[in-house]
């Protein structure tokens, strides 16, 4: 895994430590609380009633809790009665939907901005349905100059901590804007499934850059101007992301070769035929493939993906139909932010 090691990993692993670190260095964060059981959660809601996002305290794919976004106090009161408290519960104030992310490499004593992005984890078109474990769609924009100020506001203040821990590797901050102020809601120490494939396409020298970061050297970034924007769209398998009864080995068909990148996820091959992976002891729908495209302008990347993903077929599969609308919202959000910085 391409990430920092040792104490530098704590910024992702422990949500409470991450939030406290931000407060120490003057980075805005939502109100947050860590409780151990249902009684403590009930008491918290009496003392400080707000809508909260419910999360696992220790960031792990094997935790019994995955993020539940509560948009009202009533939502929160309902969910604190249902979650599994085996690892406790982290409650983070819900700040709204104006969300964006920014990636950097920290290497050679320098912070090098890479891309600004948005990820869309709601399962269905229109941002409806449950949060999936990984994004169903994503947008990435080259941003080595940090033109929206996300790195300046939410990453650069942590320089003393990076030096103290010997942090070397990638870092993503996910932030939500409320009342004109960006708040850090999460840090990730990996490039991530959505952004990595697009970022490496955007760079002219991806292998050289990765090797420079591994060696703790300042990376020399060279960008493809014609790949300024990138988009990704996931073909999700039968039942995803719900728990469903076991399904048969469903064939995955590609009518004609795609004219953009196709990344297979959970598929099996037998006799030259692809099938949606059938996990006999893991009864979940599965992510079949990601379709990625880069272009000089956002609209071109979106149009290419929408055309190409139609070439894939698997019974009961689906993908989000609102990538064009998501791209427009992304542009609107960050255009207003850029204007505010002038």
PLM regions: where:
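Buried hydrophobic positions in well-ordered alpha/beta secondary-structure cores of metabolic enzymes
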Residues: 22, 55, 91, 102, ...
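Short, conserved charged micro-motifs
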Residues: 41-43, 74-78, 146-149, 240-245, ...
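Phosphate-binding core of ATP-grasp and ATP-grasp-like enzymes
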Residues: 84-88, 95-142, 151-184, 188-195
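Short, well-ordered beta-strand elements within core beta-sheets of diverse protein domains
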Residues: 137-140, 231-235, 287-295
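Generic C-terminus detector
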Residues: 277, 282-342
């Amino acid at each position: 895994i391409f990430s920092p090691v040792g104490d530098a990993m704590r910024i992702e692993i422990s949500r409470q430590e991450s939030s406290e670190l931000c407060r120490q260095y003057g980075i805005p964060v939502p109100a947050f609380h860590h409780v151990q059981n249902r009684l403590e959660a009930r008491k918290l809601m009496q003392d400080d009633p707000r809508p909260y996002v419910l999360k696992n305290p220790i960031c792990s794919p094997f935790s019994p809790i995955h993020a539940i976004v509560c948009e009202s106090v009533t939502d929160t009161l309902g969910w604190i009665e249902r979650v599994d408290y085996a690892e406790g519960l982290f409650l983070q104030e819900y700040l709204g939907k104006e969300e964006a992310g920014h990636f950097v490499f920290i290497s050679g004593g320098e912070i090098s901005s890479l891309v600004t992005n948005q990820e869309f984890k709601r399962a269905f078109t229109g941002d409806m349905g449950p949060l999936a474990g990984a994004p169903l769609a994503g947008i990435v924009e080259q941003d080595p100059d940090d033109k929206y100020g996300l790195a300046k506001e939410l990453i650069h203040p942590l320089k003393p901590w990076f030096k103290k821990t010997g942090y070397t590797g990638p870092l993503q901050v996910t932030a939500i804007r409320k009342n004109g102020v960006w708040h850090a809601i999460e840090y990730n120490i990996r490039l991530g499934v959505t952004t990595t494939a697009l970022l490496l396409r955007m760079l002219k020298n991806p292998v050289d850059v990765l090797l420079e970061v591994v060696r703790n050297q300042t990376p020399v970034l060279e960008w493809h101007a014609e790949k300024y924007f990138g988009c990704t769209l996931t073909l999700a398998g039968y039942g995803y992301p719900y728990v469903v009864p076991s399904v048969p080995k469903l064939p995955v068909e590609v009518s004609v070769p795609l004219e953009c990148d196709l990344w297979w996820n959970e598929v099996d091959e037998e006799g030259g035929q692809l099938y949606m992976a059938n996990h006999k002891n893991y009864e979940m729908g599965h992510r079949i493939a990601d379709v990625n495209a880069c272009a000089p302008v956002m609209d071109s990347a979106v149009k290419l993906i929408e055309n190409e993903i139609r070439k894939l077929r698997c019974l009961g599969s689906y993908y989000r139909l609102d990538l064009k609308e998501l791209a427009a919202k992304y542009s609107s959000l960050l255009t207003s932010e850029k204007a505010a910085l002038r």
